[in-house]
Amino acid sequence: MSIAAERKAEVIKTNATKAGDTGSPEVQVAILSERINNLTSHFKTHVKDNHSRRGLLKLVSTRRSLLDYLKKRDEARYKALLEKHNIRR
């Protein structure tokens, strides 16, 4: 499930490191976390939707890769991001 353009713009605005920032790991992880949370709530009512569940696993894997990259580059930003989005490691 995708997120609305307004919600996506809001997520980008709150997590951007500078004006016009859409590609930093913080913004990408925030957008993925929003999509993951939407899909998680979707699965509470649609338990047998295995096609979307595969997409969820792909999103989680992508987020994990971005978090691993950020951990290698700057551990302080990594820890702040985990805490901000309540991501378990």
Curated annotation (Swiss-Prot):
Molecular function terms from GO: rRNA binding; structural constituent of ribosome
Region (Disordered): 1-24
Biased composition (Basic and acidic residues): 1-11
SMART domains xref list: Ribosomal_S15
Single Gene Ontology BP annotation: translation
Pfam families on file: Ribosomal_S15
Alphabetic keyword roster: Ribonucleoprotein, Ribosomal protein, RNA-binding, rRNA-binding
One Gene Ontology term, aspect cellular component: cytosolic small ribosomal subunit
Subunit annotation: Part of the 30S ribosomal subunit. Forms a bridge to the 50S subunit in the 70S ribosome, contacting the 23S rRNA.
Biological role: One of the primary rRNA binding proteins, it binds directly to 16S rRNA where it helps nucleate assembly of the platform of the 30S subunit by binding and bridging several RNA helices of the 16S rRNA. Forms an intersubunit bridge (bridge B4) with the 23S rRNA of the 50S subunit in the ribosome.
Family: Belongs to the universal ribosomal protein uS15 family.
Protein name as it appears in the record: Small ribosomal subunit protein uS15
